Amino acid sequence: MTDEALQKLPQRLQDTYKYYCVTEEISGLNMDSIILTPTIKLEVDNFRKEFEHREEFYKFGLTNINRVLSFGASGTGKTFLAKCFASHYGLELFTVDLANIISSGNAYAELASVFELARHVKNSIIFLDECDQIARERGSLNNDPKIRQLINGLFKLMDSLDKTNICMAATNLEEQLDRAFVRRFDLKLKFYRPDVNFIDNTIEKFIHPDFKYIKDADENIRYALMESVKNYTGLSFAEIETWVQRSEKDAILNGRTQFTQTEVYQYIMRSMGFTMNEHEKLGKYLYQEGAKNI
């Protein structure tokens, strides 16, 4: 949004824009920046196609998918999808942490202000993070009359969402969401932690172009990593990026512009609690699992 256009808004909406808009922080991202599993990619590709053909839909009284709910553990790409989509298509992105606004004591007014701002700005994404903080199934948080009033208010705001805007929400607690809240979304995406089949592709995605990446891990190491990851609940794309950056830093500190697959794997294994010599630990694990050709 240009400064000139911003100045034309009422002061309270200018303040809302400055507080919730994160558009400048996502510059340079695009839909190639995010790694998606095949299932989610199909869903997201359809979401993108509808968005790209939205003007054609409008002519026939149709609306593109514009309410998206993402489930999944932290670090699996829920927030990053909103950032990449907004940056790729040049949309304003307003991020609302529902846990924070609840504690502010003025939650509905804040939400209403963001939705009103989006109506003025148009072509924007409202991203509701930690939506489980208010949209819990009856019998939990919703016993609180203030929370019930807030969720009912949010329903009305979502139902009146301008067709040019998109509302995206994210939660780690799929099972606890209010069913009426879930039904208001056109698209539901289930994000999983990356399985091993995606680890190598993910590593390469995060490598700086000035670094050379040497794939030197043998099949035993790869097998051990695959088996280990199956039972590790903390793995995320964000962690993989951290491991790649750590390997790049080590290379720089040692006067190199290259690092190996094994180096990154070592960080992965250490983060999962491997304290022995890597190969000894891997060998022991493979033996315990009955793997052959160690």
List where the protein language model places each region.
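Post-transcriptional modification and biogenesis factors for structured RNAs
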Residues: 36
